[in-house]
C-alpha cells in the first residue's frame, strides 16, 4: 500500500499498525 508510514524507526521498531522497519523509516505494503 503506502510505502511510507510517516514514522521513523532509527531505534528499530515501528509503532504504527501494519508498518515494518526498513531502517531508518517505517514502510508498509
Swiss-Prot record:
InterPro entries: Cyclotide, Cyclotide_moebius_CS, Cyclotide_sf. This is a cyclic peptide. It comes from the Eukaryota. Disulfide bonds join 5-19, 9-21, 14-26. This is Cycloviolacin-O22. Keywords: Disulfide bond, Knottin, Plant defense. Probably participates in a plant defense mechanism. GO terms for biological process: defense response. Pfam families: Cyclotide. There is a cross-link at residues 1-29 (Cyclopeptide (Gly-Asn)). Expressed in roots and runners but not in leaves, petals and petioles (at protein level). The keyword Disulfide bond applies. The presence of a 'disulfide through disulfide knot' structurally defines this protein as a knottin. Belongs to the cyclotide family. Moebius subfamily.
Amino acid at each position: 500500500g503506502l510505502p511510507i508510514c510517516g514514522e521513523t524507526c532509527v531505534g528499530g521498531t515501528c509503532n504504527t499498525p501494519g508498518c515494518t522497519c526498513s531502517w531508518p523509516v517505517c514502510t508498509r505494503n
